[in-house]
Amino acid sequence: MAETSDCRDRTTEPAPTCAFVLGGGGALGACEVGMLRALLEAGIKPDLVVGTSVGAINGAVVAADPTVEAAEQLAGLWAGLGRSGVFSGSMFGRLQVAARSRTHLYSSAPLRRLLEAHLPPGVDRIEQLPVPYQCVAASIERAAEHWFSRGPLVDAVLASCAVPGLLAPVKVGDEHFLDGGLANSIPVGRAVALGARTVYVLQVGRIEQPLSVPRLPWEVAAVAFEIARRHRYARDMADLPPGVEVHLLPSGGPVGRCGTAGQLRYRDFGLSGERIDRAYRATAAYLADA
C-alpha cells in the first residue's frame, strides 16, 4: 500500500491560511512559473501547496523554496524540459520504447534526473519541505485519487505526472499510479479541505475559454477530458464554504481553441519563455488591482 494521506496529516502544524493550487496542463504549465514569480514578488507566500501533474513539479520547487529566486530556477527547469530528452527522441526510438513496454512511449528517467537536479540537496521526502505540500495521482488498483503528503518526493511527483500512454505508471508501495489530472486536475477542494482560507489558483488558461465542438476524431477525447476537469473544478467552486476567497490567476492570453489537437502537443516547450512572461505580466496586473 502506498503511503497515503488525509486532511488530518501534519496535525502538529497550524491550519494553512494561504494555499497555492497548481493545476495540470502539460507544456502550458510554463504559465504557472510566471504566476509564481508575480505572487512571490508581491510578497504573497503560501503555507500550503497542492499540485497536479505538471503543477506537482512547479509546486514541489516552490514548496522547497518559496522565493523569487525559486521562480527563476523554475524558468531554468522549463528551459531544460525542452533539452533534457524527457519528450525528445526519434519516432523510431519512441516505437522501440513502446514495443518493449507495450504501455508507453517515453522513459521517465530523464524527468527523474531533471527533478533531482532542481530540488535542494537533502530534500528527499515530502516531510522535509519547508512548506506543507501535497500532490495527487490516480491509483490504478483503487480507481481513485490518491494524495501524497509524505514519503519520497520525486516518486510522488513522477506519479502525479505519469501521463497515460506517454510515461509508465509509477509504482509507489504496492500501488501503481497515473497522472493526477485524471482524478483532480485543479484541486481547489483539497486546499479548502485542508483549511485554506485564501486560495490562489494557478492554471494554464484553458478554463478561461469556452470549449469548441470537436471537428476531428482525435479532438473528441480532448473535449471529453476538458468537460470532466472543468466539471470537477466547477463543483469545487460551487461547494466553497463561507469565508473562503479564491483568486483565479490569469494566464495572460489565449492558449488556442480549446478541445483541439493542439491541446495534445505535449512536447511543445519552445514557447515556454513567452508563456512565462505573458502570465507574469497578467498576474502582476491582477494582483495590483486586487
Q: Model-derived features: where do they sit?
A:
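Patatin-like phospholipase
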Residues: M1-T52, A60-A290
